[in-house]
Amino acid sequence: MESSRRPLGLTKPSADKIMEIEAEGISPSRLQLLSPIPGVWFPITLGFRALPNSRREKSSSLQVDKECLLPMESHLLSKRDIGIDTTVVLLKHLMGSRSNYSPDGIFTILGRAPMLEPVSETALRESSGLQIVRRIPTPLLTLLKGTQVAMRLFLLGLRPVRYCLRVSMLKAREGLHLLVDLVRGHNPVGQIIALEAVPTSASLPLL
């Protein structure tokens, strides 16, 4: 009867058991020697502290306890495939790993530096000394086209149209003169902007 009973505590595995463990591919580093009695082995789990048997705790030395130094599996990776939401855990993990995180729960996010505005091709040509043709400003170009259209409509001979176009042309001429003075004030270098000839009031037919 006594021989049929299983012995208490940890025992040394048999040769067949050792061969079976090696065949299964269990790493020998997972077996730690816990008891001062030679030949007693115990398999432990990754990341846990190996503790001696409670029956031998009094007789064993505290120096027998050894911490498993094998790499631990990430807590987030272990929950990745079982449908558990790890958003809160991941946020705490990221906040704890940042150097700008403070214990009171306030942390800062480093923003990107402001990007410099790209240098236009015109500015590059001007800085290199190349001569380029300046474009006419949009308001001035609009007034010039409007004046040309007004002149064509003026020749239609319709009295109401001619009256409205004459008033519009006078206002356009006034705007052109003001715009030229404004452009000259903003160009201290003295660059000359070529303007198309605007017909004077003397050359216009009387209404």
Curated annotation (Swiss-Prot):
Disulfide bonds: none annotated. It comes from the Viruses. One of its GO terms (cellular component) is virion component. Structural protein that is not essential for the viral replication either in tissue culture or in its natural host. It comes from Rat coronavirus (strain 681) (RCV-SDAV). Keywords: Virion. The lineage of its organism: Viruses, Riboviria, Orthornavirae, Pisuviricota, Pisoniviricetes. It is found in: Virion. This is Protein I. It holds the Pfam family Corona_I. Its main location: virion. The gene is N. Belongs to the coronavirus I protein family. The gene encoding this protein is included within the N gene (alternative ORF).
